Amino acid sequence: MRFDLENQAYKSLPRLLERDFGITVKERLIRRFIKNKKGESLEINIIGKGEKDGKEINIIGEAKTNLSLRHIEDFLDRLKDIREVIDGEILPIMVTHMTEPEVEEYALKKGIKVYYSYEF
């Protein structure tokens, strides 16, 4: 399994989140599993904590080489489970090498920020 896209994102997202949202990353961005309310493991590609204006922000992200509408729908479903076990505000992000314009528009309408690998 390759994690190149995620590994690039871990290094560059702190700068991008500061630039775009004024969020300072306070807890290293990592890949890990968390348990949902049913006790099932959920893989989180990008997870960490940030801060904006003294308020804690949970950074939750998914990495997909070629982002599709289906990936966004799956991520939105996963976010529902995550919100049940993580307190506080969540900033959902997706990182990708490429996607179609309408897919990025859909993500933005759903409140998901999309970052491209060329921004890293």
Language-model features, listed with the residues they occupy:
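Acidic-basic catalytic patches of nuclease active cores, encompassing PD-(D/E)XK
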Residues: 1-32
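Charged, alpha-helix-enriched surfaces in structured cytosolic catalytic cores
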Residues: 4, 8, 41, 70, ...
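Conserved catalytic cores of phosphodiester-cleaving nucleases, focusing on short active-site segments
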Residues: 13, 44-50, 54-69, 75-80
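Active-site metal-binding core of divalent-cation-utilizing nuclease and nuclease-like domains
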Residues: 25-54
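Short, well-ordered secondary-structure micro-motifs
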Residues: 37-39, 72, 104-106
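Residue-level recognition of the N-termini of beta-strands and the immediately preceding loop/turn
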Residues: 58, 89-91
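Arginine/glycine-rich "motif VI" loop of SF2 helicases in the C-terminal RecA-like domain
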Residues: 80-88
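Domain-level recognition of nuclease-like catalytic cores that cleave nucleotide substrates
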Residues: 91-120
